[in-house]
From Swiss-Prot:
A zinc finger (C3H1-type) spans 130-158, 168-196. Phosphorylated. SUPFAM superfamilies: CCCH zinc finger. One of its GO terms (biological process) is pronephros development. GO terms for molecular function: mRNA 3'-UTR AU-rich region binding; zinc ion binding. Residues 100-109 have a biased composition (Basic and acidic residues). The keyword Hydrolase does not apply. Transmembrane segments: none annotated. Residues 147-188 are annotated as: RNA-binding. It is found in: Nucleus; Cytoplasm. It holds the Pfam family Tis11B_N. This is mRNA decay activator protein ZFP36L2.
Amino acid sequence: MSTTLLSAFYDIDLLYKNEKVLNNLALSTMLDKKAVGSPVSSTNSNLFPGFLRRHSASNLQALSGNTNPAKFCPNNNQLKEPAAGSTALLNRENKFRDRSFSENGERSQHLLHLQQQQQQKAGAQVNSTRYKTELCRPFEESGACKYGEKCQFAHGFHELRSLTRHPKYKTELCRTFHTIGFCPYGPRCHFIHNAEERRQAPGAGERPKLHHSLSFSGFPNHSLDSPLLESPTSRTPPPQSSSSLYCQELLQLNNNNNPCANNAFTFSGQELGLIAPLAIHTQNPPYCRQPSSSPPLSFQPLRRVSESPVFDAPPSPPDSLSDRDSYLSGSLSSGSLSGSDSPTLDSNRRLPIFSRLSISDD
C-alpha cells in the first residue's frame, strides 16, 4: 500500500510542476515581440488559444517542449536556458523575415566601399601628369619617406620624370613678380622671374628683317645699327629705272657742255646731287650720286620752273596786273648762285607789276 501512495503523490507533483511550467511559458509568449513569418503548429496551437500568437517563432519552440515533459525536470532554470538559446537560433535563421532588417544594408556598404576605391583611382589618374616630376623633400632631407613606394614624388634623380610644359612656358615675364616683387606660386610659376629662367619658345626662329624704303629726299638712313633694321640696298641692288638713267644722262651732259652756257645757277658737285632729285621730281627718281672729287659743274638741262607741272601757277585772268612771263624771266635771269650764296635781285630793275602800276598812275 505504501508503494501505491508514493506513486500517487509522485504523479500529483509531476502534474503540478508541468502546469506551473506551462503557465510560465504562456506569460513569456505574451511578452514576445518578434516579427512574423514562422509557421504555425497545428498540434500545439489548441493548448493555449488565448495566449499564443500565430506567427511567433518562439511559440513554436516553447510548445514543442510539451511533447517531452521529462526534458523540463523539476528545476525551472533548466527549462528557461534551452528555450532562450533556441529562440536566438531561430531569430538568426529568420532574420531576413524580420521587418526591421534591411537586406540592402550590407550591399549599400559594399557599393560605398567600391565607390571610394574608384574615386581614389580617379584621383591618382588626375595627378598622373605631375607624378614623379618633383623630388621628395623628406626623402632628400632624411633619406626616408613614410609613403615608400606609394609616394608620388621622386626618390632620387633616377625616378625623376620630365614634365610636358606649355609651348609658352617661361617665355613671358611674370607681372605679379615684377610689379610687387613677390609671386605666390614661387618656383612653380609658369612665367619668368629671373633672367636665367628665360627659354626660347619652340618654333620661334629669327624674326623677319624689316625692309625700310629710302626717305623722301633720297638719302638712306645710316644711323641704323641693328641688323634687324638694315637697309634693303645692302641686300639687293636697286632696280634700274628710266628715271635713274635719265639722271645719269644729265650728269654726262654736264661734263661735256660749257659750264656757263644758258645757265641761271651754278652748282658744285656735292650740291648738284642734292638738287637733282628735286629737278626730276615728277618722274620719281631714286638717289643719283655724283662723286665729290669732280670739278664744279653747271646743270644746263634743268627745266625752268614755269615748265615743270609741279610749279605751274594757276592761270590768271586777262585783266590781272601780274605779267607771269616777264616776271619769271626777269627774276630768274638776274639771280646767280655760287657755293652756298643765295640768289640776289638787281636793285636797279623794278618788278613788272610795279612798273605797270607806275604806268597806270601816269
